[in-house]
A protein has these predicted regions:
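Specific transmembrane alpha-helical segments of multi-pass solute transporters/efflux pumps
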Residues: 1-26, 30-31, 66-67, 153-171
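Hydrophobic/small/kink-forming positions within alpha-helical transmembrane segments
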Residues: 5, 9, 13, 35-40, ...
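Hydrophobic transmembrane alpha-helices of multi-pass small-molecule transport proteins
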Residues: 8, 40, 50-72, 124-126, ...
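Structural signature of hydrophobic alpha-helical transmembrane segments
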Residues: 17-34, 82-94, 143-157, 208
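Hydrophobic/aromatic residues within transmembrane alpha-helices
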Residues: 18, 23, 44-46, 50, ...
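Helix-helix packing/entry segments at the starts of transmembrane helices
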Residues: 27-33, 103-126, 157-193
Length: 229
């Protein structure tokens, strides 16, 4: 529980730092490369073998990732250091893969959903303790700021991960990661609508490759599972 909670905390903190230093699209797209790391970690952590089609997916996802680093995005108000932010986002994706694999492993055990919820709670508590010094000094507190914090804590984090921990008991780790791509697809749209943030062309191409490859792979797995049954 502690180890998976630490991976969860690292993923959360790294993703927040990534969104502060690169574009929202880059951060969410690169974090969504978690399926790549799940494929590599599957045989070790979950005893899920690597299939031939997984090797092709690894190559396509690696191509998508490379486009983010080839893209020469200039620093902006919402993305002061795109290169560093991209690295943080990739690392966050590794933490996300470890979290999904760990929650899946815990969900298979005797503790079930209770163990998964305890892990998420421990991860949030650890993330809070690590990030607490960054909150000081407190310059201004208003109702708008408090309402955003409450919304993020209750809905964006709390309710979302309650649903996630229950769902991971019934959905394979790889498919769970790809189902969550809806957030990935909508995130750049919200960032553009609210902040006017526009990622570079190569970054968008990399994001399309990553999302498209995982969707196709999930569809292929679903079709094959149906044929086998």
């Amino acid at each position: 529980v502690i180890v998976v909670g630490a991976a969860y905390a690292a993923m959360m903190i790294l993703f927040v730092l990534a969104t502060r230093t690169t574009t929202a699209a880059n951060a969410i797209f690169l974090q969504s490369t978690a399926p790549l790391y799940l494929i590599l970690l599957g045989p070790l952590l979950l005893r899920e073998p690597i299939r031939r089609e997984d090797i092709l997916l690894i190559a396509v996802l690696a191509l998508g990732i490379s486009l983010f680093f080839i893209s020469s995005e200039k620093p902006a108000a919402t993305a002061p250091n795109p290169f560093l932010g991209n690295i943080l986002a990739v690392t966050s994706g590794i933490g996300w893969a470890l979290t999904i694999a760990g929650l899946r492993w815990i969900g298979r055990g005797k503790s079930g959903a209770e163990g998964s919820l305890a892990t998420v709670a421990a991860g949030n508590a650890l993330a809070f303790l690590i990030a607490l010094p960054m909150a000081f000094p407190v310059e201004r507190v208003d109702w708008r700021s408090l309402s955003v914090v409450v919304y993020l804590g209750v809905f964006q984090i709390g309710l979302a991960y309650v649903c996630l921990t229950h769902g991971l008991r019934k959905v394979p780790a790889f498919e769970a990661s790809t189902i969550l791509l809806l957030e990935t697809a909508l995130n750049p749209c919200w960032a553009w609508a609210v902040h006017g943030e526009r990622p570079g062309g190569l970054a968008l191409a990399g994001g399309v490759i990553i999302v498209g490859a995982t969707i196709v792979n999930t569809w292929w797995r679903t079709q094959r599972a149906g044929a086998d049954s």
